């Protein structure tokens, strides 16, 4: 059986979800041939660079504009029509890949990839079942297309919204966003604690700047580092060398035990040690944190999908949001450190949101409809 997974590099989450599925499928059935393809890179490396850099620029430099474009593309048919036309042109470039690989099923973890395959199906260029895996906590019309056979969504609220917008209930599955199974495995927790050299009797705060690094996390560090409470701090700066170097200077002056980490492929190790995570609410980061049953403290949510992710988490008592006020930031973290009952209640909410069978359920689904 050939399974084609189409994704894109706008942020790290789409690729991570795709690779998690590939790992699980191969573990369950070594005879399955799984091909994960970065759609834009395959079509044209220059196109990939343009789309990826454009996304990063909008998200980091002009987040308000990004939020407006996100809303416009969700609400206005004219905006969607422009994107549709562009994707219909690019879609034809995928035909050689599909003809050569001959997939029995296609999975997509990015809205543009979804739209391209849906277009090819509409024009009768291909006839392959399409499963769309939505990698955030709120739906957006860019994902929703007539020729999608099945949708995988992160939560029941998304199902309700999509049904209201006309998607058939039997097409939508609230399996959760697929991630590596290590995030659900608690057997190694004590090993991780020893590996990271942490005190088992102290609370641990994990600060994550995201895969590309976020400068505002430095200000949060300065607000909380001298809180009068004995906790340990892990900082992961992401792929931002300047940010890492600035933290090196700050950490050297601190009396607190701080573990400073550059970009890591072993984020599960640090999440499993944490009592709370200070992070941006990207879809995959959120899912990984919830799988580890760790309450989130959210900052710098990009208007659009990250705001929707944050809203979902806060509504379900799995996260709190930091304001831009220094005193408020300090107070929020201090309350979570000192109020065991509040932290336990949030942790219980994370535990109740159990999506540990996501990869297993998706695997069963492709076996049913291949």
Q: Which functions belong to the PLM regions below?
A:
Residues 20, 24-95:
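Conserved N-terminal ligand/cofactor-binding loop architecture of enzyme catalytic domains
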Residues 68-166, 171:
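Active-site and donor-binding regions of nucleotide-sugar-utilizing enzymes
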Residues 149-204, 208-211:
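A nucleotide-sugar donor-handling region in carbohydrate enzymes
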Residues 272-282:
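Acidic donor-binding loop of glycosyltransferase active sites
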Residues 315-320, 325-341:
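C-terminal "capping" alpha-helix adjacent to the active site of nucleotide-linked donor transferases
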Residues 342-356:
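A short, well-ordered alpha-helix in the C-terminal region of glycosyltransferases
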Residues 356-370:
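C-terminal alpha-helical cap of glycosyltransferases
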């Amino acid at each position: 059986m050939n399974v084609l997974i189409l994704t894109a590099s706008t942020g790290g989450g789409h690729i991570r979800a795709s690779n998690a599925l590939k790992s699980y499928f191969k573990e369950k059935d070594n005879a399955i041939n799984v091909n994960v393809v970065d759609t834009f890179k395959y079509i044209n490396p220059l196109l990939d660079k343009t789309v990826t850099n454009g996304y990063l620029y909008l998200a980091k430099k002009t987040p308000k504009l990004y939020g407006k474009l996100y809303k416009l593309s969700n609400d206005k048919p004219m905006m969607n029509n422009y994107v549709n036309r562009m994707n219909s042109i690019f879609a034809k470039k995928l035909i050689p890949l599909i003809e050569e690989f001959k997939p029995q099923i296609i999975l997509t973890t990015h809205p543009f990839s979804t739209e391209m395959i849906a277009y090819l199906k509409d024009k009768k260029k291909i006839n392959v079942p399409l499963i769309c895996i939505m990698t955030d906590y709120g739906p957006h019309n860019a994902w929703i297309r007539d020729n999608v056979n099945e949708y995988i969504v992160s939560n029941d609220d998304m199902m309700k919204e999509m049904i209201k917008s006309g998607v058939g209930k039997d097409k939508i599955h609230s399996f959760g966003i697929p991630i590596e199974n290590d995030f659900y495995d608690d057997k190694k927790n004590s090993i991780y604690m020893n590996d990271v050299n942490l005190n088992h009797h102290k609370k641990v705060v994990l600060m994550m700047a995201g895969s590309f690094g976020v400068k505002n996390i430095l200000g949060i560090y300065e607000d909380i580092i001298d809180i009068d409470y004995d906790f340990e701090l892990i900082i992961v700066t992401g792929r931002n060398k300047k940010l890492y170097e600035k933290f090196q200077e700050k950490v050297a002056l601190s009396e607190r035990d701080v573990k400073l980490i550059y970009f890591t492929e072993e984020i599960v190790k640090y999440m499993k040690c944490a009592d709370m995570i200070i992070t941006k609410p990207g879809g995959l980061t959120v899912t990984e944190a919830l799988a580890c049953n760790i309450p989130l403290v959210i900052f710098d949510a990009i208007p659009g999908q990250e705001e929707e992710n944050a809203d979902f988490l806060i509504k379900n008592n799995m996260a709190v949001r930091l304001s831009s006020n220094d005193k408020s930031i300090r107070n929020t973290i201090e309350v979570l450190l000192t109020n065991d009952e509040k932290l336990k209640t949030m942790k219980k909410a994370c535990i109740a949101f159990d999506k540990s069978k996501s990869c297993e359920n998706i695997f069963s689904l492709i076996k049913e409809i291949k």
